[in-house]
From Swiss-Prot:
Protein name from the UniProt record: Pre-protein VI
Site keyed Cleavage: positions: 33-34, 227-228
Organism: Canine adenovirus serotype 1 (strain RI261) (CAdV-1)
Gene this chain is encoded by: L3
Cellular component terms per the entry's GO annotation: host cell; host cell cytoplasm; host cell nucleus; viral capsid; viral procapsid
Note: All late proteins expressed from the major late promoter are produced by alternative splicing and alternative polyadenylation of the same gene giving rise to non-overlapping ORFs. A leader sequence is present in the N-terminus of all these mRNAs and is recognized by the viral shutoff protein to provide expression although conventional translation via ribosome scanning from the cap has been shut off in the host cell.
Coiled-coil regions, chain positions: none
Entry comment, domain topic: N-terminal amphipathic alpha-helix domain is essential for the membrane lytic activity. Late-budding domains (L domains) are short sequence motifs essential for viral particle release. They can occur individually or in close proximity within structural proteins. They interacts with sorting cellular proteins of the multivesicular body (MVB) pathway. Most of these proteins are class E vacuolar protein sorting factors belonging to ESCRT-I, ESCRT-II or ESCRT-III complexes. Minor capsid protein 6 contains one L domain: a PPXY motif which binds to the WW domains of HECT (homologous to E6-AP C-terminus) E3 ubiquitin ligases, like NEDD4.
Region Involved in endosomal membrane lysis, annotated ranges: 36-53
């Protein structure tokens, strides 16, 4: 049962599921399997060893020896070294020339400094002249002394002596006042009309009326809620 259930998930070789033989999975024996990198690496090593053997044979052969002797006679190595050195020096010279040109351009952009002109100092001799004397009129002084003279008021004793003796009067107004004899006491006589009338409370003529209660549901509502405040409208002219 297990083999039947998991056969769909197993890798297949064609139409046959591979349930037991796991050693062949991922190799070149399967259709669409992994690539054999070991064979490629071994082939590269073999090719490199073959090239090395060929080169060593050619270098140690008689032809190789003659070629090396010819190169030494013609001084090819020295020429190569000289060419490399001249190329390096030429590159350095070109770089130095470019740097010098850039410096000259920047110096030309700057404005030339103007030479400083020394200012000629002319010594002026001061001629002795007589001082001018100007007569100015006398100015009015700003702060003037103001002297105010005032008579002193008389003393209290002097005013008492000069005043007439005080006599009680019968009336408050001076035009109605009369001197009072010393034996009689001073009284203030008032007219009958001057006395204020006795206070008597005014009776209101407004009849007292009780609120009229209507019958039915309105009267019941008035008993529960109350009549409320009476609204009175009055017209006033200002």
């Amino acid at each position: 049962m297990d083999a039947v259930n998991f056969s769909i998930l197993a890798p297949r070789y064609g139409s046959h599921p591979m349930m037991s033989a796991w050693s062949g999975i991922g190799t070149s024996d399967m259709n669409g399997g992994a690539f054999n990198w070991g064979g490629i690496w071994s082939g590269i090593k073999n090719f490199g060893s073959n090239v090395k053997n060929w080169g060593s044979r050619a270098w140690n052969s008689q032809t190789g020896k003659l070629l090396r002797q010819k190169l030494n006679d013609t001084k090819v190595r020295e020429k190569l070294v000289e060419g490399i050195s001249t190329g390096v020096h030429g590159a350095l010279d070109i770089a130095n020339q470019e740097i010098a040109k850039q410096i000259e351009r920047r110096l030309e952009r700057q404005q030339p400094l103007e030479p400083e002109v020394e200012e000629e100092t002319v010594e002026t001799k001061s001629e002795a002249k007589a001082p001018l004397v100007v007569e100015m009129p006398l100015k009015r002084p700003r702060d003037e002394d103001l002297v105010i003279t005032a008579d002193e008021p008389p003393s209290y004793e002097e005013t008492i002596k000069t005043m007439a003796p005080l006599v009680p009067m019968t009336r408050p107004h001076p035009s109605m006042a009369r001197p009072v004899i010393a034996d009689r006491p001073t009284t203030l006589e008032l007219k009958p009309s001057d006395q204020p009338p006795p206070y008597s409370p005014q009776s209101s003529n407004m009849p007292v009326t009780a609120p009229v209660r209507s019958r039915g549901w309105q009267g019941t509502l008035a008993n529960i809620v109350g009549v409320g405040l009476s609204n009175v409208k009055r017209r006033r002219c200002f």
